[in-house]
Regions:
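Alpha-helical scaffolding within the catalytic cores
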Residues: 33-39, 101-104, 134, 206-209, ...
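Active-site mouth loops of central-metabolism enzymes
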Residues: 48-59, 120-127, 171-175
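Structural motif corresponding to the early beta-alpha repeats
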Residues: 115-128, 150-156
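Short amphipathic alpha-helices and their capping/turn segments at secondary-structure boundaries
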Residues: 105, 130-149, 233-241
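N-terminal binding-site loop/beta-alpha segment at the start of enzyme catalytic domains
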Residues: 2-114, 131, 252-256, 350, ...
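Hydrophobic faces of well-ordered beta-strands that scaffold small-molecule active sites
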Residues: 48-53, 76, 88, 114-118, ...
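Short, acidic/polar
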Residues: 58-69, 126-141, 205-209
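Beta/alpha (TIM)-barrel catalytic core signal, keyed to glycine-rich beta->alpha loops juxtaposed to Asp/Glu
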Residues: 122, 153-361
Length: 361
């Protein structure tokens, strides 16, 4: 299905295959939990190395997810953020769960062959609201369970239908409970209902993750912004020591136009685009791969799953072909692109000190 065992050493002839990993990976032990096209989570489940992100362009997501599934993608990531909102001068919307549910149904691919992720949005963090929010997602996704249910951010917003509740002065209204309360509720729901196979987080700091571990269970996955401009080496290495899988969102950095539009990041995002970096072109020529494929492979070679977002069929097909071995010197060349450039920084808008103590803050 997703997995294959690694049995033989790398040869020049096998360089472009999905199979055995290079001396870079073996020497660094960075992908010891890798089994071909998937990683093993601390739950024992397998998460595919390459997925499909679905942020924005909701009307195109049904076709895009169908194309991705047809191309072999088996990891689909979405979220509960609903309605198009103007946040910091840019349109912020997922609202894609119904389209993804329809695509999965039309694909005829057995549900147990798809790793489906969605997220709990911040206005549903009160423990009394978590299960109903999960049921809303399951209904729209047309499924009985999700493989991974994540806290989208550590901040809690005021309860209610409004996803971005604001006071008369325009400031976000904050909730009365904490993300730790929500985490405990998730654990209970997962154990009682079986409708969640694993729980995880997105956009948390190290201190915040440690608080979750102290609350009874480490996340299975931490989805965070990681790309060659923001490698977060110390933080991602820390996750390995805790058995928490790191998943990269925005694995192509500032290629997403959202970052060039939103006021909180456009100063940084409008620098040179990641895929214009000469080193990615040089390495791509060596392996007969595109710069995007090289950037994605860099993440996988470091032991992380990646969820690039595209609605363009040829790009989706190329993304699937991004699981290949990079030589050690090429991994190090891409590592050297790090500039601690973080593009997703809604701290002020969300009234929360996001990413405290991390690179790029």
């Amino acid at each position: 299905m997703y997995t294959q065992r690694l049995l033989r050493p790398v040869s020049q002839a096998s360089r472009f295959s999905l199979g055995p990993w290079s001396r870079a990976a073996i020497a660094s032990r960075q992908i010891s939990n890798y089994t071909g096209k998937a990683f093993t989570l601390n739950t024992g489940a397998q998460i595919p190395a390459i997925g499909c992100g679905t942020f924005q362009d909701k009307e195109q997501q049904e076709g895009a997810v169908l194309e991705a599934l047809k191309a072999g993608v088996r990891l689909i990531d979405t979220a509960r953020v609903k309605r198009k909102q103007k946040v910091a001068n840019a349109e912020y919307s997922y609202d894609t769960e119904p389209f993804i549910g329809a695509a999965i149904q039309k694909s005829s691919i057995p549900r147990n062959e798809i790793f489906l992720t969605t997220k709990l949005w911040c206005n549903s963090f009160h423990p009394e609201d978590v299960e109903s929010a999960l049921e809303d997602s399951l209904r729209d996704l047309q499924t009985d369970y999700v493989d991974l249910f994540m806290l989208h951010y550590p901040c809690t917003f005021a309860r209610g239908e409004d996803r971005f509740p604001k006071s008369e002065d325009g400031l976000m209204r904050m909730g009365e409970t904490t993300y730790v309360d929500t985490w405990k509720a998730l654990q209970e729901i997962m154990k009682r209902t079986g409708k969640i196979k694993a729980i995880g987080v997105s956009n948390f700091s190290q201190d915040e993750v440690e608080n979750l571990i102290a609350a009874g269970m480490p996340p299975a996955v931490h989805q965070m912004e990681v790309h060659p401009f923001l490698s977060q080496k110390t933080f991602t290495t820390w996750h390995k020591t805790r058995g928490i899988h790191v998943q990269q969102f925005s694995p192509l950095g500032n290629m997403n136009s959202f970052y060039r539009e939103v006021s909180w990041s456009n100063g940084r995002a409008n620098r040179g685009r990641l895929l214009d970096e000469p080193v990615l072109h040089e390495i791509g020529a060596k392996y007969n791969k595109t710069p995007a494929q090289v950037a994605l492979a860099w993440g996988v070679n470091h032991g992380r799953s990646v969820i690039p977002k595209s609605t363009i069929p040829w790009q989706i097909r190329q993304n699937v072909e991004s699981v290949f071995v990079l030589d050690l010197e090429d991994v190090e060349k891409i590592d050297a692109l790090n500039a601690d450039l973080r593009f997703n920084t809604p701290d002020e808008a969300y009234r929360w000190p996001l990413y405290k103590g991390l690179d790029g803050v």
